Amino acid sequence: MAAPVDLELKKAFTELQAKVIDTQQKVKLADIQIEQLNRTKKHAHLTDTEIMTLVDETNMYEGVGRMFILQSKEAIHNQLLEKQKIAEEKIKELEQKKSYLERSVKEAEDNIREMLMARRAQ
């Protein structure tokens, strides 16, 4: 009877190991994306700060591909604020995803611990 339990534990450990490795990769990817979004947000904030120091009648050009489009100061300001808002929302989503992944790995580890405790009790 010990052999089936050992096979069951071995299978559970290999599944846990695969899940941990997969989760670690996903968490690293989420961290990289969060860092990139933080840089984007900071860049937009700094650009907006510089733009707001200029007088309202200043001509501003937005780079679009290989050309530049004349924009008002207010339009560029609104675009930069929207960019910051979108980055902040994506950061929150990634943080939630990251915490979910970490929680799921912890639950899997707890299940294996319970399995080991049940085996020792037998």
UniProtKB/Swiss-Prot annotation:
Organism name: Pongo abelii
UniProt record similarity statement: Belongs to the prefoldin subunit beta family.
Recorded GO MF terms: amyloid-beta binding; protein folding chaperone; unfolded protein binding
Lineage: Eukaryota, Metazoa, Chordata, Craniata, Vertebrata
Disulphide-bonded residues: none
Any one GO BP annotation for this protein: negative regulation of amyloid fibril formation
Subunit structure: Heterohexamer of two PFD-alpha type and four PFD-beta type subunits.
Encoding gene per record: PFDN1
Keywords in alphabetical order: Acetylation, Chaperone
Annotated Gene Ontology cellular component terms: cytoplasm; prefoldin complex
InterPro entries: PFD_beta-like, Prefoldin
Protein name (Swiss-Prot/TrEMBL): Prefoldin subunit 1
Keyword Metal-binding (UniProt): no
Role summary: Binds specifically to cytosolic chaperonin (c-CPN) and transfers target proteins to it. Binds to nascent polypeptide chain and promotes folding in an environment in which there are many competing pathways for nonnative proteins.
Keyword Acetylation: yes
Positions carrying N-acetylalanine: 2
